[in-house]
Design a protein with these regions (language model features):
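Small-residue-biased structural context
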Residues: 1-158
């Protein structure tokens, strides 16, 4: 699977988790879904920051530099929102639900920009290299999923 397809698949999984949170009936289900969502977001950001964004920068440094810088800023905003949510996650109340809604909006904004801008720039890498990059992303994602995310969102690398 090429890198952009793998990342789009992740985007869909995150959208699904936001929908699951919204439809969950019990607080326990909502908190479990939040933990899954948190892990997905942190791992997704790590594989982009460690592997995907550097490759996109190499493909077209001038165009990609601004795009990647903005994406990294958005990642940092999401991480800060996760830290806030981590502090609230002892109970699901209106503030927690509203913060999840804001997180969903921020993530969706980031996804749209990434898919419409960065992925277009990434096409300059070429199909074969995107396939190889996708393999590297999947391998790193598998490593991180197996290890689990036990760090707070703020300390996750950028």
């Amino acid at each position: 699977m090429d890198a952009t397809e793998l990342l789009k698949k992740d985007h869909e999984a995150v959208r699904q988790l936001f929908a699951e949170f919204e439809s969950a009936e019990s607080d326990d289900s909502k908190l479990d879904t939040y933990e899954d969502l948190r892990q997905q977001l942190i791992i997704h950001a790590r594989i982009e920051e460690e592997i995907f964004y550097p490759a996109v920068r190499e493909a077209d440094h001038d165009k990609a530099e601004k795009q990647v810088k903005e994406a990294l800023t958005e990642h940092q905003q999401v991480k800060e929102m996760l830290v806030k949510l981590d502090g609230m996650a002892s109970e699901v109340d209106a503030d927690f639900a509203e913060s999840i809604k804001k997180l969903a909006e921020s993530v969706e904004h980031h996804v749209q920009e990434e898919e419409n801008d960065i992925f277009v720039t990434a096409r300059k890498i070429g199909n074969k290299q995107l396939g190889e990059l996708g393999d590297r992303l999947q391998q790193r994602k598998d490593q991180l999923m197996e290890a689990g995310v036990d760090e707070d969102a703020q300390s996750a690398p950028q």
